[in-house]
Amino acid sequence: MTSPIVAVSSAPSPDPRFLALGAGRYQVHGSEGPLRSETVVPADPRAPALARSVLDNEMASALLPRIADSKVVLSEVVANAVQHGTVNGRGNIRLVVDLDSERLHVRVEQELSAASVRPSYSPLPHPGGFGLRIVEALADDWGAEPGPPGCVWFQIEA
């Protein structure tokens, strides 16, 4: 049985400061700025594609100049969360995407700690280990927060 995408909103429904924009999206009431999307995806091989669809469906028009970079970085961070941030590839990954007129900020929260997240610079050829080097090259800023839940975040200027 496959797990569906589950969208969640962190905005409490009775709070009048937030205007609901659909499942998992909200915006400060009366403004055109910052947009937040919170989504939970299953920690399985589909997770990077599901995460990219969040950017496609929710925020692509605001990120036109850097949407490709944003999707590549998101794919790498989510793939790392599936591979290294879950127990035997089971569980969920939570995406928190904040977008305003100046930047995209994404948090990818995983079940295990993210304390040892760093790019690999091994001189020996190996089949992987380039994901965080790609993140470092394309994101304007990125980092990790220990957990659990652990979090890897990145920021891309719009």
Where are these regions (language model features)?
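Short acidic/polar alpha-helix capping motifs at helix-coil junctions
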Residues: L19-G22, D44, N57-A60
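Conserved beta-strand-loop-beta-strand hairpin that lines the nucleotide-binding pocket
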Residues: M1-E38, V82-A158
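Conserved short strand/loop->alpha-helix "switch" segment adjacent to the catalytic nucleotide/phosphoryl-transfer site
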Residues: R52-S75, L124
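STAS-typified acidic loop motif
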Residues: E38-P48
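Heptad-repeat coiled-coil signal-transmission/dimerization helices
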Residues: P48-L55, L132
